[in-house]
Amino acid sequence: MKTITRTQTGVRLESRLLKVLKALATELDMSLGDLLEGVVLHAFEGKAPFGPPTLAKIEQLKAVYGLTLTAGDAHQMEERP
């Protein structure tokens, strides 16, 4: 196990996306920070962060929280005033 230093940060995320991420972290019994670190580290290496069972759970959570955004929407969103 590697020893690291974490920094507290404030980030703004789309509301429904955050709800799905928090629920997924709870489902996987990890913190939101751990989940985000894992997703980013996998993305940096061009690897998929989730297998089929977790992807199925994500689809369920997206339906529960009304998340319809996709990767195609990334960097194309405009925040309401």
Where are each of the predicted segments found?
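Extended hydrophobic secondary-structure segments
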Residues: 13-18, 33-36
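Short Lys/Arg-rich basic patches
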Residues: 1-15, 22-25, 62-72, 76-81
